[in-house]
Each structure stands twice: as C-alpha cells, then as structure tokens.
Amino acid sequence: MFRPFGRGLLLCAALALAARCGAGATPIVPTNPTITTDTFTGQLTPNGAFTHQFAVHATGKVTATLTSVQPDATKTIGFSLGTVIGTTCQAVLANDAAVQTNVLTGTAQIGGSFCLRVYDVGSVTTDTGPFTYTVTVEHP
C-alpha cells in the first residue's frame, strides 16, 4: 500500500531536482568573429601581376570583390585567393576572366596568412595602357 505512494514521492522529488538544475545557468551563445575589410589597389602593365597579403584571424567566409577596373570596366583580368606558403601565394580559388564586380568566395578553415593575386591575362597592352584595379576583401 505504501509502495505506490513512495514511488510517486520519489518521482516528484526527482522532477523537482531536475527542474532546478537548469536554474541560473547561462546558455552559451557563440560569438561571430569581427569582419575586417581590406582594400587593395594597383596598376597592371602587360604581363604584370601583384600579390597582396592579409591576415585572417578566425574561421569564416572570405570574399574578394573586384570593385574597379579602369579605364575600361569590361576588360578582363585575373584574380585569385589563396594561402601564403613560405613566400609563395598558393592559389585556391581563381578567375582568369574576371571583370569589374566579379566575386571570389571561400571559407577559411583556420586563421593565418592569406593572399590575393591580381594579374594580366593578355588584356593589358601597350595600346590600352596600364589598368588600375581595386579589390575589396572581407574576412574574419
């Protein structure tokens, strides 16, 4: 006769303790890394190339946007994103026919030294003159 009552009392005590366990605990909310914007500019001559380095401080999305190609925004150039290995920019993503507003997007799995390379793909000639470019890179 007392067993069902005892079990019920034990069950109520266990439920009360379980409900109390979460009280006062602050849930862990992941923080998003601060996004850094780097702007790189340069002037491409025939067969020319430039490498720009930047530091990524956390995992996350890396986006490079070819924001300007002058004097003719329709002319193609090449640009790539990669990692720095020693003194070399090892391309991971590349567009060999990029025009103004083209975007490269990747994900940094770890922080470290990354690079952007901008290069002539045959569009810059002595007749066209040098091309001035601007690339914006957003990264954690």
Predicted feature residues:
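Sec-dependent bacterial lipoprotein signal peptides
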Residues: M1-R20
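C-terminal edge strands of extracellular/lumenal beta-sandwich accessory domains
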Residues: G22-I35, H52, I77-T87, S113-P140
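Non-catalytic, beta-strand-enriched accessory regions in extracellular/secretory proteins
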Residues: T36-D72, G78-G82
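Beta-sandwich interaction modules
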Residues: N95-Q109
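Extracellular and analogous surface-interaction loops
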Residues: T51-K61, T105-G112, E138-P140
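Extracellular beta-sheet repeat scaffolds used for adhesion and glycan interaction
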Residues: I85-D96
